[in-house]
Amino acid sequence: INIMYNAARKHGKIVQVGQWQRSQPHFVDAINYLKSGKLGRIRTCKAWSYVDWKGAVPKVPDAPVPAGVNYDMWLGPAPKRPFNMNRFHFTWRWYWEYGNGLMTDWGVHLIDYILYGMGKSVPASVMAIGGKYAFPDDDMVTPDTMTAVYDFSDFTMIWEHTIGIGLGNWKRPHGMSYIGENGTLVLDRNGWEVFPEKQKIEAVPVQKNVGNGQDLHARNFLDCLENNTPEKLNAGIEVGRRVALVAQMGNVAYRTGEKIYWDDAKQQFKTDTANKLITPVYNNGYN
């Protein structure tokens, strides 16, 4: 992502990333409410993805590359290994070489809105626990159950994900919450609402989703291209760069088993074990 970010800046390109919720009207309304200050001081934020529709990934033998597939191109810089359907379309996301599990798959969408709402870029430290608790013997490598805790110095963000369980926080399979001293704002792709703390503020009933955020996101991108106005992008390349880093931090903390600390000036962690996991290794002629 740093290479893409630097290339976009160097060549003056207009690049929009897929955080389309920034173009969804009810998400915009929720953030406007958050920024009104009615919730009071925010001390904790949560983001979560509970995926009950996802089951185990049974082990299957390696197989010949399907006709019409340029496997070398599909692999790109990833390590070369025999073709296996589990590592191909969709299920590739459960292997470290290609994807990074739910922590990044859903995390880049939901954590982005925590960062956006709270006006933050990176945490001071991260720690994480979890494992393959639901399907310990299947072919997935990434954890099916995980919690990561991010310290932003003046508030804490908690990420949770599970596979095989769908009843998440506030009875939502996915979402975000901003927990303030006066009340809590809960937000997902279906709508948002506010729960008051001891009647300090008025409750806000569910404000339902309207419009199509993905279409509006594409329209925003095209408008910026037509008018050469990169400053009006709802989610420029810097947005993707930032949230990809923060989501990956959760995985790095999980994989090292350490509480990790970030040095933003040096753009690296403070330990070699953590830095090793964000140092790219290119294969198949890529560099």
Where are these regions (language model features)?
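Beta-strand-loop-alpha-helix segment that lines the small-molecule cofactor/substrate pocket
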Residues: I1-S23, G37
